[in-house]
Amino acid sequence: KPKEDKEWVKFKAKHITSQSVADFNCNKTMNDPDFTPDGQCKPVNTFIHSNTGPVKDICRRASGRVNKSSTQQFPLTTCNKPIRCKYSQSNTTNFICITCRDNYPVHFVKIGKC
């Protein structure tokens, strides 16, 4: 079994959550020490409420480094504009555009089609 791409491992940790939209809490997640290793609060981050399978499938048959749009919509939560690390939270359901590298998602480009 080939070793998982390091960037994919980081992508999963940063952008994929098994929590439901209703249970998800931006402040709790974004201020987790694992999420802010340097102690700085990130200005914005989008989370995909999904198992890893459907997200990884977006990059099936993607060779090299390429941006791809999902064919299905995902429930998404965006945490943004922290004031002293307190985030506002917005939810939507939409397609996503991600950067794939050799069949693995490695970067979240934007909400919506590429």
Swiss-Prot record:
Pfam name, any one: RnaseA
Binding-site list for substrate: 42-46
EC number(s) on file: 3.1.27.-
A GO-annotated cellular component: extracellular region
GO molecular function, one term: nucleic acid binding
PROSITE patterns according to UniProt: RNASE_PANCREATIC
Gene Ontology terms describing biological process: defense response to Gram-positive bacterium
Active site: 15 (proton acceptor), 107 (proton donor)
Disulfide bonds: 26-79, 41-85, 59-100, 97-114
Cellular location(s): Secreted
Known glycosylation sites: 27, 67, 91
UniProt keyword list: Disulfide bond, Endonuclease, Glycoprotein, Hydrolase, Nuclease, Secreted
Function: Endonuclease, hydrolyzes highly polymerized RNA, poly(U) and poly(C), and the dinucleotides CpA and UpA. Hydrolyzes rCA, rUA and rUG. Has cytotoxic activity against cultured human submaxillary gland carcinoma cells.
Family: Belongs to the pancreatic ribonuclease family.
Subunit architecture: Monomer.
The protein's name in its UniProt record: Amphinase-4
